[in-house]
């Protein structure tokens, strides 16, 4: 996984890698519990690598109660049964791990020369939740014969898209280099950095989590065998 490998190579690699590991072990399920416990559900979270402070971001257009709030990681609520549609997007320029709840967007874009690299990272994280099924019209993202990440014709799907369904409608559509400009999207800047936009909010990212072709080929082959 290119993003994790790059994090391990950075000066603060151990703490960044540990934070990402904690998120995938239990942190995402605890963030899911935090995000679901208010009238203004969170659309994103950031976890400060050095302090462990978690910032919760409701939708920027949520009106009253839409301001961000903070809590220590140790004070997060007990985990839910799943991480819902939370994905680790990358590491911000201020050394915070950015987590986005894809359930907060009907359509969210990934733009850049290789948008499928970031889409693969999201898909692999989403598949950790057994309730999620991914459908895509992109051969660069589908996993062989896996019923949980299959390639299929998607009506109305102009361009490459990924549909994320956890049984709780509406589904989230991830579009890659779409001609339709939306308010929620990740811009890949070509050097491993990027910018995440959710409505009026933006997070500069010094590292975007991606999965390159070689790693994806090995992962998809393993998952394809498991599905068979």
Model-inferred region functions:
Residues 1-228:
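Accessory regions of macromolecular translocation/handling assemblies
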